[in-house]
Design a protein with these regions (language model features):
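Catalytic core of pol beta-like nucleotidyltransferases
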Residues: 1-3, 7, 19-26, 36-201
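Short, glycine- and small/hydrophobic-rich beta-strand elements in well-ordered beta-sheets
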Residues: 7-15
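N-terminal loops that bind phosphate or other acidic moieties
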Residues: 30
């Protein structure tokens, strides 16, 4: 990326299981690249640079211009900030550190998205893969909810699990896999519905 963009790269980081030290063989390589600006030709240059990298098939992540990142939804920036391990640069030089209000927004908007997708999937798609993806997404909502209650962000699933009880703990356990479609859909739906009511803005 340095050869493709020179001094335009304001930040490079890594997210996901590799950032948390929980990666398995074949886990995605979630890279964050923030440039001073990002136009469509820059996307093409990113793609060309990525083609030469080893394990290209695992590469994914987030690419943005600095102004777009600063204008991003604060609730989404909460998880983005806390889930990103810096490799080059500091996110704090680009965005303010997200706080408790941003965490509340993350819980509410995340729960709304899960609620809608879960009900749609149960009624129409009946897709176990989509349910698994929603359960994985719930982990970000759970981290934000835990932050609201403790003031601490727990990246590790094991550390997070130690602090959760009740429906929160049940959803996290379902996100680890092997859940029955009907039962897991019910638990996830009821959990998301409760959070929407609790965190209504």
């Amino acid at each position: 990326m340095r050869s493709a963009f020179g001094g335009r790269g304001g930040f490079i980081g890594i997210q996901g299981s590799r950032a948390r030290g929980e990666a398995a063989e074949g886990s995605d390589i979630d890279v964050v690249l923030i440039l001073d600006r990002l136009d469509f030709d820059d996307l093409r240059r990113c793609r060309e640079a990525a083609e030469a990298l080893p394990h290209r098939e695992l590469l994914c992540g987030f690419v943005s211009g600095a102004d777009e990142l600063r204008g991003w939804d604060r609730g989404e920036l909460f998880g983005f900030y806390h889930d990103t391990r810096p490799v080059l640069g500091r996110l704090e030089e680009l965005i303010p550190v997200p706080g408790a209000g941003d965490a509340r927004r993350a819980v509410h908007s995340g729960a709304c998205g899960i609620y809608h997708a879960c009900s749609h999937n149960y009624l129409h798609e009946r897709d176990a893969g989509l349910l698994a993806a929603l359960l994985k997404t719930s982990r970000f909502v759970l981290r934000a909810r835990c932050f609201c209650e403790t003031g601490r962000y727990f990246s590790s699933l094991d550390e997070l699990a130690e602090r959760l009880t009740g429906a929160d703990r049940a959803v996290l356990e379902l996100s680890r896999g092997g859940a029955d479609f009907e039962a897991a859909s019910r638990v996830l739906y009821d959990w998301a519905r409760g959070l929407i009511e609790e965190y209504a803005i």
